[in-house]
Amino acid sequence: CHGFDSGYDITKKEGVESLLSEIENLFGLERLKMIHLNDSKYPLGAAKDRHERIGSGFIGEAGFAVFFSFKEVQRIPWILETPGGNEEHAEDIKKVFEIIEKYRIEVD
């Protein structure tokens, strides 16, 4: 959500490549220690940073599938940062695995 709301279109391969390249050039991917994982209530570039449950916002399942497909992203721990309590969080974790399976994403 943070990057997406800032204008990085992580729903497209080119957008993820651009974001990863910028991170590498600014401070190095090896220094990126975690990713907050959540969908966005608002469209790309809205600069509002309002979180939504996985697959229920403007990033959507297909967008997450693109993002999850990058090995660089897979190597960094993901911290779920979605609205709700334990039950909703468990459903969101399940949704992440469903997206990985549905889109046949190879995971290291």
UniProtKB/Swiss-Prot annotation:
Coiled coil: none annotated. This is Probable endonuclease 4. Its cofactor is Zn(2+). GO terms for biological process: base-excision repair. It comes from Thermotoga neapolitana. Zn(2+) 2 binds at H36, E81. Zn(2+) 3 binds at H2, D49, H51. Belongs to the AP endonuclease 2 family. It catalyses: Endonucleolytic cleavage to 5'-phosphooligonucleotide end-products. InterPro entries: AP_endonuc_2, AP_endonuc_F2_Zn_BS, Xyl_isomerase-like_sf, Xyl_isomerase-like_TIM-brl. Its EC number is 3.1.21.2. One of its GO terms (molecular function) is DNA-(apurinic or apyrimidinic site) endonuclease activity. Endonuclease IV plays a role in DNA repair. It cleaves phosphodiester bonds at apurinic or apyrimidinic (AP) sites, generating a 3'-hydroxyl group and a 5'-terminal sugar phosphate. Pfam families: AP_endonuc_2 (PF01261). The keyword DNA repair applies. Keywords: DNA damage, DNA repair, Endonuclease, Hydrolase, Metal-binding, Nuclease, Zinc. Binds 3 Zn(2+) ions. It comes from the Bacteria.
